[in-house]
Amino acid sequence: MRERLRHCKRVIIKVGTSTLTHPGGHLHLGRMEALVRQIADLHFEGRQVILVTSGAVGAGLGRLGLAERPAEVAAKQALAAVGQGLLMQRYEGLFSEYGLVVGQVLLTREDLEDPDRRASSAQVMERLLAWGVIPIVNENDTVTSEEIRVGDNDTLSARVAALVRADLLILLSDVDGLYPADPHLHPGLSPIPWVSPDDDLDRFAGGPGSANGTGGMVTKVAAARICAEHGIPMVLACGERPDVLRQILAGEEIGTLFSREG
């Protein structure tokens, strides 16, 4: 199955808050630059790439000099309003260095569940890809309450992958993959190279996400299962690894491959 990843044309890449920001919440420009360079390389290879990005709330946190992510919904929505603009400004500047244009796509749960809005969202992204634009997707946190959220960007990226009939979803996080036990408690463990989303993975998926994010291994396993329902493989890998996207799409055994075929 790894060898088949070399031929994936339409790829969804999700990058998490822990990869995009420093612990204090400020954007990690070095990692953003490395990510954009890799995506540009994939684009010029002839692949279609959609980026699902976290980091809006974290960027707002850093810009306003706040020490902790607030629990209040309105405060998080306000932080997203500040941070989303900062995030897109950075992406626009970085991609423009490669002559690439980006398009912001902010989605809500209704955009993915209502048939008419779902069809409209798919048409917009198809048009952007046809024009050679890099769609940059995030949940519209500013107008979305906790009760009607998609939930997290792992789930969002899987739903986007299904929406546009992607060939592959890559989740970039602060972990190297799915481990058989907590690697913090068991140093020296290697990630599991391949698992089926149909397996009992919940025992491997304990633990919350990072302090500035909303995800964790539970949401990544859930994303893999959404992808599996649509025949889409998913790879979970560390976003801090140099050239991680090139290595995955070269068929190298990087991270954990979630697929019904080994």
Curated annotation (Swiss-Prot):
Residues reported in the UniProt entry to bind substrate: 54, 141, 153
Catalysed reactions, semicolon-separated: L-glutamate + ATP = L-glutamyl 5-phosphate + ADP
A Pfam family annotated for this UniProt entry: AA_kinase
Binding site for ATP: 14, 173-174, 214-220
Alphabetical list of PROSITE patterns matching this protein: GLUTAMATE_5_KINASE
Gene3D superfamilies registered for this protein in UniProt: Acetylglutamate kinase-like (3.40.1160.10)
The protein's annotated pathway: Amino-acid biosynthesis; L-proline biosynthesis; L-glutamate 5-semialdehyde from L-glutamate: step 1/2
Protein EC: 2.7.2.11
Keywords, alphabetical: Amino-acid biosynthesis, ATP-binding, Cytoplasm, Kinase, Nucleotide-binding, Proline biosynthesis, Transferase
KW Amino-acid biosynthesis (keyword) present: yes
GO biological process terms held by the UniProt record: L-proline biosynthetic process
Subcellular location: Cytoplasm
GO molecular function, one term: glutamate 5-kinase activity
GO cellular component, one term: cytosol
Protein's UniProt keywords contain Transit peptide: no
Annotated InterPro entries: AceGlu_kinase-like_sf (IPR036393), Asp/Glu/Uridylate_kinase (IPR001048), G5K_ProB (IPR041739), Glu/AcGlu_kinase (IPR001057), Glu_5kinase (IPR011529), Glu_5kinase/COase_Synthase (IPR005715), Glutamate_5-kinase_CS (IPR019797)
Record-stated family: Belongs to the glutamate 5-kinase family.
Function: Catalyzes the transfer of a phosphate group to glutamate to form L-glutamate 5-phosphate.
UniProt-listed HAMAP family: ProB
Name recorded for this polypeptide: Glutamate 5-kinase
Gene expressing this chain: proB
